[in-house]
Amino acid sequence: MGKIIGIDLGTTNSCVAIMDGGKARVLENSEGDRTTPSIIAYTQDGEILVGQPAKRQAVTNPQNTLFAIKRLIGRRFQDEEAQRDKDIMPYKIVAADNGDAWVEVKGQRVAPPQISAEVLKKMKKTAEDYLGEPVTEAVITVPAYFNDAQRQATKDAGRIAGLEVKRIINEPTAAALAYGLDKEVGNRTIAVYDLGGGTFDISIIEIDEVDGEKTFEVLATNGDTHLGGEDFDSRLINYLVEEFKKEQGFDLRNDPLAMQRLKEAAEKAKIELSSAQQTDVNLPYITADASGPKHMNIKVTRAKLESLVEDLVARSIEPLKVALKDAGLSVSDIQDVILVGGQTRMPMVQKKVADFFGKEPRKDVNPDEAVAVGAAVQGGVLAGDVKDVLLLDVTPLSLGIETMGSVMTPLITKNTTIPTKHSQVFSTAEDNQSAVTIHVLQGERKRANDNKSLGQFNLDGIQAAARGMAQIEVTFDIDADGILHVSAKDKNTGREQKITIKASSGLNEEEIQKMVRDAEVNAEADRKFEELVQTRNQADHLIHGTRKQLEEAGDKLPAEDKTAIEAALKDLEVAVKGEDKAEIEAKTQALVQVSGKLLEMAQAQQAQQGADAGADNAAQKDDDVVDAEFEEVKDKK
């Protein structure tokens, strides 16, 4: 059985880890980095770039460079969050036929799971390069507050990337695993505050140790799936745009290239202000108008940044109160606070969290890597490599159905430990009703329409009866991934209908299969491209070597041979500029054949040079011989 890898599929950065000799190891990607930017670029010549290479070309290709795609995964186009992003992202967010939020790239609509799959493929390849064997199974993390549609979409992304997703686990829970596994922590209650690039979670987790077995039980979770570092960046970008407009009278929002440069500079400035009190955002030639080029040079202090994002940090405090209340605990019951996610490096965030809990957060957990490490540990548990660890996670939101009067009736309440199963009997609202529609909802609001609709299905053929007499048993079954399966059964006739909730949004099986096939075709295209580059490089090497030998041969080479070689060289140089591998190989072979005489001359010249060098060395050695007397000295005993 191969390794089950752990992947933290982040909004801003992603990370992959494996269990190696009983320890979790974070792997370096092909660029030598332990985290990979979750950025995907579609270039003009059809290449797909992921990570740092995609980030590097973003300034010149802003419309086709996609970032923060996790904020769109499993979302409807009409969702408030998708509409907010539509107005600020440099790329185009559009509605899919099924109403989902998709992205338009080079005139084609692409689904967020398909885009995220490109990042997962890079993580998969990173692990394969390290292990030297194929990887087909993974544990992928999601924000604890992700709903059913978002979890399902993440699983779909895994499938498109060629991975069997063995388990979806919550990011704070994964961080707790990373923290608690190798420490003699005893019985403790911890709070994991996870503020990443695009999402925020708080989880209250109890770690119990009994006879050497550690149980990680999530007591409560809360959060905001649209609050993260990207929002902090946006605040700073907006401030810089307004300042520039005041100074120069020019709105940079109309210039996508300038906005891309500004995004990079704002992110860098934000990071610098975690350790410095002030920084300069200096962007020469950021744009130009009729009067000439314009430059940006704006000083930003830490205090200014804090004033811009104060309300965002405050927004993260309310879920802390709710999570503690749901867990039935007070601040004094929390023994350790763990910070996860790059945005928690901001001093203001650390201070607010410390003030709330009345204690300093721990500094021995790497906020960028802890989640991937925890995912790898869970992979080890599933593979049987890690013993004595039990993980009890919860469902973040209540699940129920719409009942008479458009009311949401919960069957499974939030923070219920999963996997779980619950049944409830309902009845008909009309006399002789022959069918019922089961409308499945997720959320905490009383009015059905105020909750997230996960889907609906019909149960037909109900036995005719007076209103309220028919007995319809509805069963909700949540698996370990937090994904919901629903069935409805007429208890009188035994007639039953079942569905695995595929949200009213989401990809259908046919779409997923097509994307899997597309990914396989891309993999084949990538392999062919690598072979073409290799063939080109060999041809270039031959061209360079042949030209050098031609120069050295001078007039010693017969004119007809020289003409034939020159012609073959020209043909190969033309072929190398093209995309036809077979053509390059054929022209390479043709050059090798006509260069026979030249090669013989070059080899003869090398042999002669070798012989001359040998003779010189021998003469040198003779000259260096020195007559000397010597005396044998016996060792003293």
UniProtKB/Swiss-Prot annotation:
- Keywords, comma-separated and alphabetical: ATP-binding, Chaperone, Nucleotide-binding, Phosphoprotein, Stress response
Q: What does this protein do?
A: Acts as a chaperone.
Phosphothreonine-modified residues are T199
Q: Where is this region: Disordered?
A: 603-637
The conditions that induce or repress this protein are given as: By stress conditions e.g. heat shock.
Q: Does the keyword ATP-binding apply?
A: yes
Q: Name one GO molecular function term.
A: ATP-dependent protein folding chaperone
InterPro entries assigned to the protein according to its UniProt record, in alphabetical order: ATPase_NBD, Chaperone_DnaK, Heat_shock_70_CS, HSP70_C_sf, HSP70_peptide-bd_sf, Hsp_70_fam
| Gene3D superfamilies named in the record | 1.20.1270.10, 3.30.420.40, Actin, Chain A, domain 4, Substrate Binding Domain Of DNAk, Chain A, domain 1
Q: Which family does it belong to?
A: Belongs to the heat shock protein 70 family.
Give me the stretches of Low complexity compositional bias: 603-618
Its gene name is dnaK
Instruction: Report the PROSITE patterns cross-referenced here.
Output: HSP70_1, HSP70_2, HSP70_3
Official protein name in the record:
Chaperone protein DnaK
A Pfam family (short name) is HSP70
- The domain of life for this entry's organism is Bacteria
Question: HAMAP family, from UniProt?
Answer: DnaK
Is Chaperone included in the keywords of this UniProt record? yes
